[in-house]
Amino acid sequence: MLEKFTVIRGKAVPLRGEDIDTDRILPARFMKVLTFEGLGQYLFYDERFDEKGNPKPHPLNDPRYRGATILLVESGFGSGSSREHAPQAIKRAGFKAIIGESFAEIFFGNATAIGLPCVSLAPEDLGVLFRSVEENPELEVEIDLVNKEVRFGDRTAPLFIREEAREALVEGLWDPIGELLEAGELLDQFDRKLPYPRRTE
């Protein structure tokens, strides 16, 4: 059974900047892998480390945000190439959800398909959330996909997400391949009803 995403809670890390593309999220040279395992360590690598591998000032290197599981972004996040490695790197770095103003369409789809919810807030609400987290890194942020709300401090803001994506995440139907694997016996039954030659093993 795939995980059902109803309420996601955690600390957040603010990442300012519009139109952050997938090349920045995960530099292309780190895509030469056979699996997605370990991609999290290369998240925003060129912005977090210099050519010698020394840390640079960056929100993801800031100890105040250590342990954050929600990524705050601005508009146009995930633009550029359609590489699915980008959302994989974010998820494998420990993030459970992304809150932003808007997302590139292909990135949004790739993220949803691996169980990484991307929800949008109105610019005013997002601005308040950014400032709140920057002022208080320990602030707990709550994403309620059932009631379509983001809660933090004493504030509640409506979230926006495509309804089909929200339903898939809430019902645990976000991974088509996973659904097929879980439906093994049903597929076998269907296969036996087909008129053409079928596998016998």
Curated annotation (Swiss-Prot):
This is 3-isopropylmalate dehydratase small subunit. It comes from Thermus thermophilus (strain ATCC 27634 / DSM 579 / HB8). The gene is leuD. The keyword Secreted does not apply. HAMAP family: LeuD_type1. GO terms for molecular function: 3-isopropylmalate dehydratase activity. One of its GO terms (cellular component) is 3-isopropylmalate dehydratase complex. Belongs to the LeuD family. LeuD type 1 subfamily. Pathway: Amino-acid biosynthesis; L-leucine biosynthesis; L-leucine from 3-methyl-2-oxobutanoate: step 2/4. GO terms for biological process: L-leucine biosynthetic process. Pfam families: Aconitase_C. PANTHER family: 3-ISOPROPYLMALATE DEHYDRATASE SMALL SUBUNIT, 3-ISOPROPYLMALATE DEHYDRATASE SMALL SUBUNIT 2-RELATED-RELATED.
